[in-house]
Amino acid sequence: MLIRILAFLLETFFFVLIGAALLRAWMNGCRVNMRAQPGSFVMAVTDWLVKPLRRVLPKAWAQSRIDGASVVAAALLAIIYALVWALLFGVLAGTADLTAFGPTALLPLLAFAVKMLVRVALQTAMILVFGFAILSWVQPGSPAYSLLGRLTEPLLAPLRRVIPTIGGVDLSALALILILQIALMVLG
């Protein structure tokens, strides 16, 4: 039971960090004001890694429309998560051989990191769309609704072209949540 609690805490910690880095890239891509909430929170959580990466990465890539430094930060965090997870739970299970950490162990770790990165991206998108859908019913005039609308519009616009409104209700958010959930099920 202690191992499950430790796994949950480790995954939650890295989920927040990776999600914040991906959200920072998405918010920059959507030209959202980063000085307001949740932008200031996202910047506070990710500045320690994104700012040094901006100095190291080529300027054209690090500060492009999609914030490359934030995407690289999310990828690095996913790799660190995979390494920590493999070492920690391999040692606790008694299966870790720290001397045999070579190229053969690298591919499964990278696959694990990519899976974590994709899962966090899908779940973050689902949270944004779910929040947007709820606010569209409860408080459509709020600043949070406007922010979530800007963040989810690139995801919802293609579906709105295909799915008609029924009785004045836009079902594109529901369809996207279903698509994201299916993608998470396929991811495993």
Regions picked out by a protein language model, each given a short descriptive name:
Residues M1-G188:
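Selective transmembrane helix interface/packing segments
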